Amino acid sequence: MPFSADSVTSLRQLADALAARSVSAEELAREYLARIEQAAALNAFIHVDAERTLAQARAADERRARGEAAPLTGVPIAHKDVFVTRGWRATAGSKMLANYESPFDATVVERMAAAGMVTLGKTNMDEFAMGSSNENSHFGPVRNPWDTSRVPGGSSGGSAAAVAAGLAPAATGTDTGGSIRQPSSFSGITGIKPTYGRVSRYGMIAFASSLDQAGPMAHSAEDCALLLNAMAGFDPRDSTSITPAQGGVDEDYTRLLGQPRAGATTERPLAGLRIGLPKEYFGKGLSADVEQAVRAALAEYEKLGATLVEVTLPKTELSIPVYYVIAPAEASSNLSRFDGVRYGHRAAEYRDLLDMYKKSRAEGFGAEVKRRIMVGTYVLSHGYYDAYYLQAQKIRRIIADDFQRAFAQCDVIMGPVAPTVAWKLGEKTSDPVQMYLADIFTLSTSLAGLPGMSVPCGFGEAGMPVGLQLIGNYFDEARLLQTAHAFQQATDWHLRRPGKA
């Protein structure tokens, strides 16, 4: 019987099949490229270069033949189009960069290539990672594989849809205010945002530099741990990368998977784990279907030996205004370089240099990006800096301190990723504030720089996936992944696929 990726449920199985020569990297790449072509209506990919992909796959096969294969050699991966890639376009979902090709690879892309992974293409995303639905892309919206009339989440919606639909076994994403966790939840996959600084930002087109963080998106916690092993580590080219002296040491993120906690048993592997439930995450605004799925997941954790503890994160509501001051302020600075001279689209007709700047930016940026640039410029302007930006930074510190008080009472925090399941395409586009409010449960984690992840935990309205959010303390990714893996060993939500749920 010929090999089919449909029979594979994890990256480890895929790696084992490659190692056993049940399939070659080239055969695997061809299978996924065919799937991408067949599912073009999802609009998950912006750029596919089959010849380049197959050349990488053949190189992986040659590496294996020489006995030089790493654990992930030959395994395909899709990259969010916010990472620059030599030889591929890197658009950030924007007309401004529609034809941009980078002369170098982002560190994340470089490290995945060093691990032998094969790039399938560049995935669609909200323009410059600004959005929660993947409707802000210059290249059109991405459709959710579970219901193509709904959004996949954003801004890493193309990556989430690609993994959920089986167009790629794994993908890279970025998370500034929830852009790995929320689309993972909406699309029924697993994704983790590491501690800020764990993964290099070098070559990642910046949105908000103090918040942006790259991470893996796949089907399971084990997959994410394997990917994080390849992805994470100190990078001297990124000034925000955590140095070894600061705690950014290389580690094996798979080391705790399947291991009971100290003093626990195999039947109750999480005995002694204290799960903090922020009361602010279970109040008004949380839909009943999402709460039901999350509560059922928490009950499963109790069966695994964990205890539930109520904690408080009193400034949760303030995370929205704080984020939407700080992130646009940083975006207005970062995006100033896209002026038609240094980078990006240049208007065809203009009177003088100033007119060229204005027309190039007006034509090159979409509505949401323009909105955030204007907000950011305003809050940084003379007379408003202290009232808005400085005040937001002070509250950001309070939010981080609130998490530390909560972690004094628990080991991991859990709750919903989003207040609802994925909404219909176009449902919120006319009301940006409603779109922003959908990020209520993910923003504070990003503001604090903490690691957080989403794991599938059930289904809600219209059979749409629901994600459980797990939040850890700084550098606690291995424990988060262990905790998520234990849940996935006891349940099968992460094995469900669109059309087969």
UniProtKB/Swiss-Prot annotation:
GO terms for cellular component: glutamyl-tRNA(Gln) amidotransferase complex. One of its GO terms (biological process) is translation. Pfam families: Amidase. It comes from the Bacteria. Allows the formation of correctly charged Gln-tRNA(Gln) through the transamidation of misacylated Glu-tRNA(Gln) in organisms which lack glutaminyl-tRNA synthetase. The reaction takes place in the presence of glutamine and ATP through an activated gamma-phospho-Glu-tRNA(Gln). Belongs to the amidase family. GatA subfamily. This is Glutamyl-tRNA(Gln) amidotransferase subunit A. It comes from Cupriavidus necator (strain ATCC 17699 / DSM 428 / KCTC 22496 / NCIMB 10442 / H16 / Stanier 337) (Ralstonia eutropha).
